[in-house]
């Protein structure tokens, strides 16, 4: 009887973790383009974060890398504070002028925006042109072409 309760308790824990994981990822939608590096990273947008005002759009983006990114570490575990598997950004896109600016940037030690986080420097006043065949161009196509 004790073994059966314990195994049911373990099963309930596994189911709860899976449900929580799915709900945490519920708003993230993969963005795929032929010009992205297949197998190296996956780009997602948070469909719940899309905000529109006039011809401007704001959106949260998550980039999940297959291999760890950042500077090489030192020591027995080769880890450093600047190593990460995923990043999130909050971007503001001007659809008419095809310009983008970064509002927030965070690196995460683990996949899908999990684990210890480190915020990066952002200059919200700096607008950049949206170059062809880039992540920003894919976001512009997704969010601005169908207005």
Predicted features and spans:
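N-terminal secretory-pathway/extracellular module detecting exported/lumenal segments
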Residues: 22-90, 94-147
């Amino acid at each position: 009887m004790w073994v059966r309760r314990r195994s049911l308790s373990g099963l309930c824990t596994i189911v709860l973790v899976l449900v929580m994981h799915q709900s945490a990822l519920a708003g993230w939608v993969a963005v795929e383009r032929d010009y992205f590096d297949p197998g190296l990273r996956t780009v997602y947008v948070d469909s719940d974060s899309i905000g529109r005002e006039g011809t401007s759009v704001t959106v949260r983006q998550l980039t999940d890398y297959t291999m760890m990114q950042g500077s090489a570490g030192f020591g027995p575990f080769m880890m450093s504070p600047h190593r990460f598997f995923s990043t999130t950004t909050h971007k503001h896109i001007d659809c008419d002028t095809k310009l983008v600016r970064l509002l927030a940037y965070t690196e995460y030690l683990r996949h899908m925006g999990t684990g210890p986080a480190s915020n990066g420097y952002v200059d919200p006043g700096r607008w950049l042109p949206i170059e062809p065949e880039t992540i920003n161009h894919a976001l512009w196509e997704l969010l601005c072409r169908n207005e």
